[in-house]
Amino acid sequence: TLEHYEIGPGIEYIKIRYESVPLTLWATTIDMTNPYNVIEQVQSNNSVPDLKRELVQDMSKRLTTPGHKVCAAFNHDFFSYDEGVCIGLNISNGVISMPAGSGRSTFAITQDKTASVFFPVPECKAISASGDEVTIDHFNWGAETIRNGDCVLFTNMNSLNLDAEGRYIKIRPRSNWIVNGTPTVCDVLEVSDLPLQTSDTDFVLYLRNTKLNSLPDIKVGEEITISQKLVAGKFGTPPDNILQAFHGYPSIAYEGKLHDGEYNDFENGREYETSCRTMAGMSQDGKTVYFVATELSENSTGINCIDIANWMLAHGAWNVVNFDSGGSTAIVVDHTMLNLPGRGSLRPVMDGVLLVSTAPEDNGVAHYSFSKTQLNVPIISLAPLTLISQNKYKDVIERNVEVEGFAFRCEPAELGWVDKGAVFHAGETVMSGKIIAEKNGITAELPVSTRPVQDIHIAADEILIDSVRPYRINLEGNINGQVYTLDPAAFAWTSSNPSCCRIENGILKGIENGETSLVGTLDTITVGLKVIVEVTPETLVHENFSDLSDFPLFSTVSNTLSISHEELPTGWPDGAVLQFDQKTGRNPYVEMGKSYRLYSLPDSISLQLNLSKEALAAIKHIRFDFTHKNGKSYWQPEYIPSDTGDQTIAWAFSKNGIAFPTEDFPLTLDRIRFVLNPGSRSEITIPLRELKAYYPVKASSAINNVHIENNFAWITAEGELRLHYNLQQTGSADISIWTTAGQQISEYISNRELPGTYTYNIPDRFLSPGIYILTIRANGK
């Protein structure tokens, strides 16, 4: 469980990750007995039909007003692109928007906030003051061919310009609408043989063909009553006073089990189709409602509706229905879509589900909650904590609350401790307890259980550190084959040479050049680590080519290979010139075989050279061959020159933007190879100068000629598009993608994590060609 907390009055939100599948799942649980929440069905842009449709996050934002805060939203019904309408019966605030089409089950919410599932059969009528009545065949029309019925009620959601021949009666309701309740009395505003139009307040009853002369005595100023009724069909009983209803297509589970004859009667066997999904469920008493959404992405596999229904049954659902899936699937919290689109792009939809707080606006903090309801961690492990602030109604005021000013304690104290960055350090004893956070007299509690861990060890036997970057000892343990990072601060550490480095809470900081042996003890457990400290300068020239007496050279295509100080380029105070003739041969290259063990932990390395036209034509690429501390081949970056004259080859010691692990240093440059283009050439000269390493001058900066860290985040595009970011302190990152028009189309908020470098795979595959803006907020920037 990644997150679990209340996002509104009686509205619980949970995010779960099943790594073994893999699957990411979101669920909301709504306590319908809470007086400050409602569930609403809404049409895109409040229009039927609506060929434009609307993103769920835009529905959420548009319909949030004071006292009507949309806490979460989901996509809902299947729809027709051409007609601009949903395919089943839906009810919005007591008004039927479209009555049947391909409809199957209905998931309804009554006026007293009770959920039910049934197969609906509409029986709707218009009744005049004189007692004449006519059956309403249809509600609203589609954009093209769905023009059903000889008696049609066009509601205030109608977006068509009515122009068909027939008889028109414009009406205005005196009260709210309801289905299976007291019929709605309306005033007759106009009666005409010419088209009349609907408005936000006015409906139009349209009569034609066999019903053209129905309600013959209706007059302006009289009453007309609209009765909307749903009667029993194949299963279930429609309740009284239905306020909201959602087409459920096939009923997947009914009365606690899979609904035989319904779940397995999905066209083309779609019940077994694996995709991302949105589904709805209810408890047996109808007072708890569930909505579930899953993601389909590179990191989350598809799943069928049967498996989701069984998951929901196991977690309290009694009836389960199926909403639209695939590219339409969307869960939105705080107007932000949480899942990645499942079919390659953001898809506007025809209608949605809103989970709404009707509580009065209140920005006063009355509650703090942790982002999880339970924490299960290994002993002596580290777990960053996240706090949420809420008002007295449980509306969220702020996520990822700043932890400054909080006092933390653990009960019992042996459970562990919480540092000033709100990182929990689990104790060394297996137990259960709780973490208590308190600020301004308001407390939050988090139940905690710690588990035993085996095979506790340090990941490396020997480590090289510098005098700038702190290094947390990489302590690991194992639970059932899963490796966990443990807390080195739980150990008592001794050093054979304390003058070269300092250790505090399991974190090393180099002081002066030297070596030490560290020993950590915890009860009967002992671990050891050899530490070498090499204090960093700003730069260090590893080769200035002043001494050429020991400079091994090798070539597959030259017998005249040499290096000298003759004929240096103008303005060069030092350096050397590599000179050779090239004869025809296979695999042509020239190699400088001198080896350089790089001092300390450089950020990057550079080599200056000067290329003539002849040298540029000869060189295919220049390759540096590095080995890591164990002597194995590690990295072979290649530089392809594209111009003549002075130039600098430079590489950062990173992969995909992430710095090489400290555990891999020291690195050794074994050779520099000039790979040549085929052919024969005479008197090729390559001037070389200053093989130089660059080092950080402080912990948060780096000197780097290629890989620039202007702030704390950078993007790489080597194979996949990735965003990399540094957390300088325990915290989270908020990453968003925007259009140039300022529309937010994706947001990802990481869990609170320990200081370090992290990677986010940018979901570019769902973006259409164009220009986008990516923003990241972390470290208070």
Predicted regions and their residues:
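Gly/Ser/Thr/Pro-rich low-complexity, intrinsically disordered segments
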Residues: 1-492, 496, 502-539, 672
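Residue-level detector of functionally pivotal "anchor" positions at catalytic/ligand-binding pockets or at interdomain
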Residues: 363, 694-718, 728
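Extracellular carbohydrate-recognition regions
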Residues: 534-560
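Short carbohydrate-recognition loop motifs
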Residues: 564-588
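Extracellular ligand-binding interfaces
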Residues: 582-661, 681-687, 694-697
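Short beta-strand-plus-loop segments that form exposed binding edges in beta-rich domains
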Residues: 673-681
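Terminal processing/anchoring signals of secreted or surface-associated proteins
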Residues: 700-705, 713-714, 723-725, 742, ...
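Short, surface-exposed loop/turn motifs with a glycine/proline- and acidic-biased composition
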Residues: 749-780
